[in-house]
Design a protein with these regions (language model features):
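Conserved SAM/SAH cofactor-binding pocket of Class I
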Residues: 1-52, 62
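Active-site capping/gating segments
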Residues: 5, 83-121
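Conserved beta-strand segments of alpha/beta enzyme cores
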Residues: 7, 32-34, 75, 96-99
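Short strand-turn motif at the edge of the Rossmann-like AdoMet-binding core
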Residues: 13, 55, 79-83
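Short amphipathic alpha-helical segments
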Residues: 22, 62-66, 88-90
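Short, well-ordered alpha-helical microsegments
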Residues: 43, 58-59, 84-85
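A short glycine-rich, Lys/Arg-flanked "PGG" loop and its adjoining helix->strand segment in the class I
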Residues: 60-76
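Conserved beta-strand signature within the Rossmann-like core of class I S-adenosyl-L-methionine
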Residues: 72-86
Length: 121
């Protein structure tokens, strides 16, 4: 709605969720929003940004979605609970964390953060 020039693809393995996104896009006349029923590891279209929430460990997330990341400028964003030090240590050698943003969720007394990653140059 705010950025009509930005294409957004919401990928989910659950067909009903992808269909809901498609229906919402039609109802709201959002030509730039797409619901995609697929597994992230099957995507071949390059994306500038790939994000996830409650999906997988960081190593699995970057491994499974790597073929869809637009290299060399693409970035990954992963919402996690507390700072995932063990997952960061287990990342592939060519993947770097370049920012971790701590989040405060109103009404939720739990740690949350967003981890920003990219392929090392």
């Amino acid at each position: 709605i705010c950025c009509p020039d930005v294409d957004v693809s919401c990928v989910d393995t659950v067909g009903k969720k992808a269909a809901f996104i498609q229906q919402a896009a039609v109802a709201l006349k959002l030509r730039n929003l797409h619901g995609v029923h697929a597994r992230v590891e099957t995507l071949t279209t390059p994306f500038d940004l790939i994000s996830c929430r409650a999906f997988a460990s960081l190593p699995d997330f970057v491994t499974w979605s790597r073929s869809a990341l637009a290299a060399p400028h693409g970035v990954w964003l992963a919402m996690k609970g507390k700072h995932p030090e063990d997952e960061i240590a287990a990342l592939p050698a060519d993947v770097a964390v370049f920012h971790v943003e701590q989040l405060t969720v109103p009404g939720l007394d739990a740690e949350r953060c967003i981890v920003w990653l990219r392929v090392k140059n």
